């Protein structure tokens, strides 16, 4: 019972609250002898300092005990150390310790002491935090000596730097606001009282030899009296009124500084001051005083803060020169997708072929043993190539969602930053993280940012940092284990600029082309977006018709189209989204937004109306000759945000087309130049600059027909670009020269002749339909819009002259005449 009482007394003494690790607490507690057979209690006190301090204080007291009892205690203590968070431990609250001691006392004898020792030897569990568990460490002090305080740092050096920075700000603010308060270990500053007196009092004090020190600044004079005189001056009423505003701190000296202003016509009594041995001088204006010093100190504080924020060196107990990311992430912008909105293949439509290519990847990630046991090597990398907006990133997310594995995504531009060597280090960290969480997926978006070819064709100057990053990426991709279960997905829209070493089998084994969707794919994409948004559609909306109107649209374009249609319907306060909303959204995507206030007037309005009618007349004549060609459905002379003053809408064909025949190309050339031809006919040769975009597009089409498509008889089936570059040599060399000046001149002459022939044919078509040109032009000028059946009623009387028929069928008579004339 005596032993239990001693243990209870010791625990009660240990339950005193510990506020801070002061010097008095660092002394070990005195020993307490046990009254029952020499058995003793081991007590551990944990003092957790307030939040913000970076140390944990641990005191342990080890007392002597008999060998047998000591062995039992050590065995039980080891078991307590190995137990989890739910183990019993002695607390610093007095009631719990007293209850435990009382229970031990009832058991009696040595067993009670041993039980108490076992419970008390269990270390307290520190509270967990989001930054990780504090590193509490226990050290056994051999020899049974007196217990010691153990100090363990639980914060990193960077956090300690910020704590010191905050302390510096606090001291700076304290010195600025309360300069009279002394810092620890320094003498308190004397409180200064400034008293303004007349200049006559200053002269009288000089004559009486009462002045100790004078500071002259032009006509402004500050002076202090001698100590015995200053003591008497403290009792004057004007001085007491000046000192009432200053805090009266005990033990803080005060001083009085008198100020006065010297009249400009009176000299300063320097001779009298020299005679009375008065210290005098002028202020040093090279230093800006208190404000300048404060600004300098503030600049230093801000500079230290910036350095601590951006410095990539860790001040922790690890390597002093170890580089790490300033954002506390070794992998740069790499992040694991933890979104609850999981993307699957059901959310991806219009790219069925790409889905099939990626299904095997998904199956491998779900069941890798199925392939590994057969000796099959899974694809180490899959490169997704396609136009912007076709869904490359969405496909990668769908692969991760189907396989239910960690999806680590990053952008290739995040690898290379300011610090040299950071790119390669981040690549290593990224792949190490992926291997640790395998099976997993690494997705590198816009991989061409760091993987451009190193042969000099696609770079202007050398960039060693990017080359190091690329080399590390090549090494990591080629250094996978066969069972690592980590797959790399890369996305780019510039596969031609990638380094050949990256595209070879063994790194990116598969290249999946993600193309723009066809008509059925566009319809599927529209259904997905409509169902996701739960869009209320009108009865006149047929998504197959919308898909037919949007030839060439990508998945991102279609998503934006659905959103624009919903916005237009909401702008009109509609309850449902109608077909007209989708049509307006398509026109906004193609031609821009109609301007409500910028209206054409006068002669410009008439010219633009005839220009658009010229396109419609020539396009209708071409459609009459070529079956299956779409017809003009809408004319408008309302200016749009894209810079177009007029708009001629010709919908795409009802079926997807992948080839363009020579007669269709010639028909498009004539249609593009129909507006310019109408201006020449109506204005008698006084044309405008309104055909700028038409001429640009027609020139591009004619050049490709001559120089790339091989549709010209004089040039023949030759690719002029390949011929001028010296072939398709991968190294960029020129095996047989690039001096092809005569060929370039010939191409230019052929392009010019083709465009001139198309313009002459367009003039013939416009002159053959004067009634439609004038009548429809005047009607469009008045109404600003013509569409639908009303437009078709005007265009049904358009005729196609024989010149158009000859030109579309490839007759070269006019072209040859132009060449002979030149």
Swiss-Prot record:
Cofactor dependence: Zn(2+)
PROSITE patterns the record matches: AAA (PS00674)
Low complexity: bias regions: 1-34, 80-94, 101-122
Membrane-spanning residues: 154-174, 288-308
GO CC annotation: chloroplast thylakoid membrane
Residues the record lists as binding Zn(2+): 611, 615, 694
Membrane topology label: Multi-pass membrane protein
Domain of life: Eukaryota
Cofactor detail note: Binds 1 zinc ion per subunit.
Family the UniProt entry places it in: In the N-terminal section; belongs to the AAA ATPase family.
Name of this protein: ATP-dependent zinc metalloprotease FTSH 7, chloroplastic
């Amino acid at each position: 019972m005596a032993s239990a009482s001693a243990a209870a007394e010791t625990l009660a003494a240990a339950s005193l609250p510990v506020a801070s690790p002061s010097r008095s607490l660092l002394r070990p507690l005195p020993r307490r002898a046990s009254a029952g057979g020499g058995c003793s209690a081991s007590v551990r006190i944990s003092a957790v300092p307030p939040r913000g301090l970076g140390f944990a204080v641990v005191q342990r007291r080890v007392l002597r005990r008999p060998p047998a009892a000591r062995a039992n205690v050590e065995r039980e203590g080891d078991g307590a150390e190995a137990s989890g968070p739910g183990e019993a431990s002695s607390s610093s609250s007095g009631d719990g310790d007293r209850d435990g001691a009382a229970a031990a006392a009832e058991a009696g004898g040595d067993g009670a002491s041993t039980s108490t020792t076992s419970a008390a030897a269990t270390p307290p569990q520190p509270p967990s935090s989001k930054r990780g568990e504090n590193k509490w460490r226990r050290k056994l002090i051999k020899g049974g000596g007196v217990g010691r305080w153990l100090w363990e740092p639980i914060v990193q050096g960077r956090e300690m730097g910020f704590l010191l920075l905050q302390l510096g700000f606090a001291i700076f603010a304290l010195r600025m606001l309360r300069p009279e308060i002394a810092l620890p270990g320094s003498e308190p500053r004397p409180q200064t009282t400034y008293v303004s007196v007349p200049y006559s009092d200053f002269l009288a004090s000089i004559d009486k030899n009462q002045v100790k020190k004078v500071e002259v600044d032009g006509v402004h004079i500050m002076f202090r009296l001698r100590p015995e005189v200053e003591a008497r001056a403290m009792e004057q009423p004007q001085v007491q009124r000046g000192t009432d505003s200053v805090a009266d701190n005990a033990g803080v000296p005060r001083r009085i500084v008198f100020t006065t202003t010297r009249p400009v016509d009176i000299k300063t009594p320097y001779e009298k001051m020299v005679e009375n041995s008065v210290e005098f001088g002028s202020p040093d204006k090279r230093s800006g005083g208190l404000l300048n010093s404060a600004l300098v100190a503030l600049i230093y504080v801000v500079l230290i803060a910036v350095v601590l924020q951006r410095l990539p060196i860790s001040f922790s107990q690890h390597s002093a020169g170890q580089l790490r990311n300033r954002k506390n992430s070794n992998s740069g912008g790499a992040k694991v997708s933890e979104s609850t909105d999981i993307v699957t293949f059901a959310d991806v439509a219009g790219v069925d072929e790409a889905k099939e290519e990626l299904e095997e990847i998904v199956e491998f990630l779900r069941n890798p043993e199925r392939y590994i046991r057969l000796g099959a090597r899974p694809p180490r990398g899959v490169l997704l190539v396609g136009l912007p907006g076709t869904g490359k990133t969405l496909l990668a997310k769908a692969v991760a969602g189907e396989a239910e594995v960690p999806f680590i995504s990053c952008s290739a531009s995040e690898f290379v930053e300011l610090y040299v060597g950071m790119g390669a280090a981040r690549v290593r960290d990224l792949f190490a993280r992926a291997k640790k969480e395998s099976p997993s997926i690494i997705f590198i978006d816009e991989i061409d940012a760091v993987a451009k070819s190193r042969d000099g064709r696609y770079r202007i100057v050398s960039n060693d940092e990017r080359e190091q990053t690329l080399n590390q990426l090549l090494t990591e991709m080629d250094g996978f284990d066969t069972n690592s279960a980590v797959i790399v997905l890369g996305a780019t829209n510039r596969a031609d600029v990638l380094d050949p070493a990256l595209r070879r089998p063994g790194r990116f084994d598969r290249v999946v082309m993600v193309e723009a969707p066809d008509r059925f794919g566009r319809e599927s994409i529209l259904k997905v977006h409509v169902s996701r948004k739960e869009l209320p559609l009108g009865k006149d909306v047929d998504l197959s018709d919308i898909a037919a109107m949007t030839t060439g649209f990508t998945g991102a374009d279609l998503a934006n189209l659905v959103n624009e249609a919903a916005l237009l319907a909401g702008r009109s306060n509609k309850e449902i989204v109608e077909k007209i909303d989708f049509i307006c959204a398509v026109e906004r995507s193609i031609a821009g937004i109609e301007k409500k206030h910028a209206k054409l007037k006068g002669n410009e309005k008439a010219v633009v109306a005839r220009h658009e009618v010229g396109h419609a007349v020539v396009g209708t004549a071409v459609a009459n000759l070529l079956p299956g060609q779409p017809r003009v459905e809408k004319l408008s002379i309302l200016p749009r945000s894209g810079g177009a003053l007029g708009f001629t809408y010709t919908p795409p064909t009802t079926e997807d087309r992948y080839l363009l025949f020579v007669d269709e190309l010639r028909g498009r050339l004539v249609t593009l130049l129909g507006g310019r031809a109408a201006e020449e006919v109506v204005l008698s040769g006084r044309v405008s600059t309104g055909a700028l975009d038409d001429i640009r597009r027609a020139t591009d089409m004619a050049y490709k027909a001559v120089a790339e498509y091989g549709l010209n008889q004089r040039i023949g089936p030759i690719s002029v670009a390949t011929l001028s570059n010296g072939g398709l040599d991968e190294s960029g060399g020129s095996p047989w020269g690039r001096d092809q000046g005569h060929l370039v001149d010939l191409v230019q002459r052929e392009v010019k002749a083709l465009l001139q022939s198309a313009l002459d044919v367009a003039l013939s078509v416009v002159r053959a339909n004067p009634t439609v040109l004038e009548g429809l032009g005047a009607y469009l000028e008045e109404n600003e819009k013509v569409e639908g059946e009303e437009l078709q009623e005007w265009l049904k009387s358009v005729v196609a002259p024989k010149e158009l028929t000859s030109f579309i069928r490839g007759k070269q008579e006019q072209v040859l005449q132009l060449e002979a004339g030149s």
